[in-house]
């Protein structure tokens, strides 16, 4: 097959867009700003879901489901949250259509079917969930309340890109209620760490843990914790957020509990989420000019086996050997695909599975059967080797672990060599437009400076790293005193 992929150095954005479509991950739909996630792309998302869901349950959370629609009066109860999302909301105003008498066979909105109160299509679910929690929480015995929801949300984006920014996207959102401030802060930090663990151990993406500035904070939160990743083009991508909500939503929706002394108090809240944006992060962190590169821990197919034969008799002999190998690999929980299609030649299959990022490819022909060997190819570095049949199972198992580690190490090296300390604004601009990546710089702590830097350079403060050390310095832009460095970058 012909890939005809634009290279990353030619046009990184075009390379990404082409890869998503050609690797059969997703495509644009007939609805502006919305995507169709195709089976192969959805299989990767399912792997992500499965691991995250396990991690949530291991930390005591349960899944539930809440309505897609939120009455406008309920949505606006927490003012900062409503104001923050207002411009992105899709709004339902009518509840039915009718036949259009002036245009036979066509429909129109029935003007007599106007809703008494508009319904907001959820951009996030704090309002509907906290209004429900009011009925669930009465006593300290009902706490903590640890709930997660897998859902779709709608944010009316004008400039969309597959996986990275779409009007409708899939995500999970956790919403928890606690008896004390300390418990809620601990939960917020715990879930940030869960996300970081998932990103590093499953996605093979190193992340910086930190918290957002007040300007970048989630609308309605007292603090937003985040994990930030760096893509191959030197732009950052926010890979997960966890919000300490204080008592803001509890007060807006009057969620109170009787403490051990019988006194009424408002609960403390958190919310946290990751979305199908993670698919974009996965693609952009590891993939190359040949196509997708998937870390084994999230690859729907970890090993593909391609037979090389000229006769049906040869194919039958190869298939017998492959069936034996496949059974042994599957016992080790390794996902295997035997591509015995007779409609395509081996070269086409090699190119197709390379494009789709399958971590390990095994080729076997009549000579391999004679010699008791298999040809094994790695997708990440495109290397090949011949492995004895008696060693193949252990070799493949070890190889998958090695590829997972190597992908993380490669991404970590790139990330670490693209964190640059700067001490003046000229240097800041030079690094931003040249090398790119994270820029570690002093900031005076004001929203005005943050906004001016963004206007002039398009760079935002990605986070204040949790491990940032106290260091006296002067703001890179204003020269005012600063106590620590923050990370700036251009971002998706």
UniProtKB/Swiss-Prot annotation:
List cystine links: none
Molecular function in Gene Ontology = ATP binding; proline-tRNA ligase activity
InterPro entries, per database record: aa-tRNA-synt_IIb, aa-tRNA-synth_II, aa-tRNA-synth_II/BPL/LPL, Anticodon-bd, Anticodon-bd_dom_sf, Pro-tRNA-ligase_IIa_arc-type, Pro-tRNA_ligase_II_C, Pro-tRNA_synth_II
Q: What is its main location?
A: cytoplasm
CDD domains with a match to the protein in the record: ProRS_anticodon_zinc, ProRS_core_arch_euk
- Give its localization: Cytoplasm
Q: Which SMART domains match?
A: ProRS-C_1 (SM00946)
**What keywords are assigned to this protein?**
Aminoacyl-tRNA synthetase, ATP-binding, Cytoplasm, Ligase, Nucleotide-binding, Protein biosynthesis
Query: What are the EC numbers?
Result: 6.1.1.15
Reaction catalysed?
tRNA(Pro) + L-proline + ATP = L-prolyl-tRNA(Pro) + AMP + diphosphate
Q: Secreted as a keyword?
A: no
* SUPFAM superfamilies hit by this protein: C-terminal domain of ProRS, Class II aaRS ABD-related, Class II aaRS and biotin synthetases
UniProt keyword annotation of RNA-binding present: no
GO CC terms of this entry: aminoacyl-tRNA synthetase multienzyme complex; cytoplasm
GO process terms (BP): prolyl-tRNA aminoacylation
Tell me the domain of life: Bacteria
Functional note: Catalyzes the attachment of proline to tRNA(Pro) in a two-step reaction: proline is first activated by ATP to form Pro-AMP and then transferred to the acceptor end of tRNA(Pro).
Q: What is the UniProt domain comment for this protein?
A: Consists of three domains: the N-terminal catalytic domain, the anticodon-binding domain and the C-terminal extension.
User: What quaternary structure, including any partners, is listed in this protein's UniProt entry?
Assistant: Homodimer.
Family statement drawn from the similarity comment of this UniProt entry: Belongs to the class-II aminoacyl-tRNA synthetase family. ProS type 3 subfamily.
UniProt-recorded name of the protein = Proline--tRNA ligase
Gene transcribed to yield this protein: proS
